[in-house]
């Protein structure tokens, strides 16, 4: 068995490729079912965010398992192999373990130390459990990854002052406004006519950061007005005009700055729409949706300044050097957590031998106990029989305690294999045969 991860991220693929592998809510169950049907996969879960799609799995054979997952990704995306494959990465065993720990800690994020990824890793664990696709190995790994993410944020300064995708989007708007006035600095958004399209979690974060940057009024559009009004109620200090998304054209004509973050699978704003409406001289569009809410052809329209999630790098790079230094604090913790998991993983190699040894001694115990009880005759009470049986079990447990503890203790793989060989020879254990025995139901 091998732990493997196959996927792509903002580091390996542009948004136009990533959006092809964004799994919408309605296709999550089907995706899990298709992955579970793959013979090579023993356990599996999916991490899907705006910046990454990663399949974590326990596979029988690493090469065959990775190829099977790659085939799933090709089929799901509809992309040709020569287009998708250059953007995919895969890690096995130690590298896969290290990767998920780093992802959960925010070390692999566009914004180092951002907190939202931890919630997304938690969701990956929950999805795997809900779809009954996690077994003891992957459940242990992903649960420990969540704990590692929490530990990094509580024991280091990496999470302090970390920006998110939403805050980076607001900062990008401030930066572009400053540059338009000939200044390489962030400017307040007080005078901007702002609109936010979408009322989900990312939009909530957008509103938080817009409020902190001086925005005191905006238009909020959503497919259902009630959800927009519920979100608006959480921000009483901002004057929010809630509208249905049907009013998008009107909103675009009145706004100077529009943020989009919807779950739409197709663009809701394109060049054709922008050309038709009567707009302000300059309209800034910032799209943090994946798949993209704004078509790439919007950039070709005069008076339109359009940005997507990949453009956030301009903002992130401004304070990345300082955050890289903070990331060094987390690396030691991640190495420690990886070592703990891998030691546990290695200790599993002893389980078949331990079970075989325990089974052999248990057979001897039962056989000898039966002989002894038969010699005691009918005068031996049921209570006395229980005492003798408990005594025999206690002796077996005492005999097993030291070798089992030694076999499970952290040690090199070669040392563990040597210890297992000695035990198997001394007790004449046929571990391979015991593994192939059918289980009693």
UniProtKB/Swiss-Prot annotation:
Pfam families from the UniProt entry: GlutR_dimer (PF00745), GlutR_N (PF05201), Shikimate_DH (PF01488)
A single BP term in Gene Ontology: chlorophyll biosynthetic process
Enzyme Commission identifier(s): 1.2.1.70
Site entry (Important for activity), positions: 99
Binding site for NADP(+): 198-203
Class of enzymatic activity (EC top level): oxidoreductase
Residues at the active site: 50 (nucleophile)
Transcription regulation in keyword set: no
Residues binding substrate: 49-52, 109, 114-116, 120
Keywords: Chlorophyll biosynthesis, NADP, Oxidoreductase, Porphyrin biosynthesis
Catalysed reaction, written as an equation: (S)-4-amino-5-oxopentanoate + tRNA(Glu) + NADP(+) = L-glutamyl-tRNA(Glu) + NADPH + H(+)
Biochemical pathway: Porphyrin-containing compound metabolism; protoporphyrin-IX biosynthesis; 5-aminolevulinate from L-glutamyl-tRNA(Glu): step 1/2; Porphyrin-containing compound metabolism; chlorophyll biosynthesis
Family matches, as NCBIfam families: hemA (TIGR01035), PRK00045.1-3 (NF000744)
Xref: HAMAP family: Glu_tRNA_reductase
Family assignment from sequence similarity: Belongs to the glutamyl-tRNA reductase family.
Role noted for this protein: Catalyzes the NADPH-dependent reduction of glutamyl-tRNA(Glu) to glutamate 1-semialdehyde (GSA).
Name listed for the protein in its UniProt record: Glutamyl-tRNA reductase
Species this chain originates from: Prochlorococcus marinus (strain NATL2A)
């Amino acid at each position: 068995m091998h732990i493997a991860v196959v996927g792509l991220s903002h580091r390996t693929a542009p948004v136009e490729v990533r959006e092809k592998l964004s799994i919408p809510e309605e296709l999550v169950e089907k995706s899990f079912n298709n992955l579970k049907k793959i013979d090579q996969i023993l356990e599996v879960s999916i991490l899907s965010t705006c910046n990454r799609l990663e399949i974590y799995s326990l596979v029988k054979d690493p090469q065959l398992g990775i190829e099977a997952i790659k085939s799933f990704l090709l089929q799901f995306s509809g992309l040709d192999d020569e287009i998708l494959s250059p953007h995919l990465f895969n890690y096995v065993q130690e590298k896969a373990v290290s990767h998920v720990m780093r992802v959960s800690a925010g070390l692999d994020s566009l914004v180092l130390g951002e907190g939202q990824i931890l919630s997304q890793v938690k969701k990956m664990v929950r999805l795997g459990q809900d779809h009954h696709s996690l077994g003891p190995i992957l459940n242990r790994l992903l649960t420990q990854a969540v704990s590692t993410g929490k530990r990094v944020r509580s024991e280091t300064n990496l999470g302090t002052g970390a920006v998110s995708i939403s805050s980076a989007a607001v900062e990008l708007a401030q930066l572009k406004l400053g540059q338009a006035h000939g200044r390489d600095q962030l400017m307040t958004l007080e005078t901007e006519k702002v609109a936010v399209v979408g009322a989900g979690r990312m939009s909530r974060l957008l509103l938080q950061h817009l409020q902190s940057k001086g925005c005191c009024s905006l238009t909020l559009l959503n497919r259902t007005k009630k959800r927009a009004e519920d979100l608006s109620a959480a921000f009483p200090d901002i004057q929010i005009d809630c509208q249905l998304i049907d009013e998008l054209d009107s909103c675009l004509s009145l706004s100077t700055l529009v943020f989009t973050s919807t779950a739409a699978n197709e663009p809701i704003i394109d060049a054709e729409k922008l050309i038709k409406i009567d707009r302000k001289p300059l309209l800034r569009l910032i799209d943090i949706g994946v798949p993209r809410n704004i078509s790439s052809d919007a950039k070709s329209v005069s008076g339109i300044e359009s940005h997507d999630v990949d453009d956030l790098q301009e903002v992130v790079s401004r304070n990345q050097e300082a955050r890289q230094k903070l990331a060094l604090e987390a690396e030691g913790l991640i190495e420690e957590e990886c070592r703990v998991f891998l030691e546990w993983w290695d200790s599993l190699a002893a389980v078949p031998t331990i079970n075989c040894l325990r089974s052999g001694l248990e057979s001897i115990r039962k056989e000898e106990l039966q002989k002894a009880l038969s010699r005691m005759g009918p005068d031996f009470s049921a209570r006395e029989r229980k005492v003798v049986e408990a005594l025999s079990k206690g002796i077996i447990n005492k005999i097993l305690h030291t070798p089992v503890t030694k076999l499970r203790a952290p040690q090199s793989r070669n040392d563990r294999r040597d210890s297992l060989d000695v035990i198997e020879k001394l007790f004449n254990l046929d571990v391979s045969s015991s593994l192939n025995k059918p289980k009693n139901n």
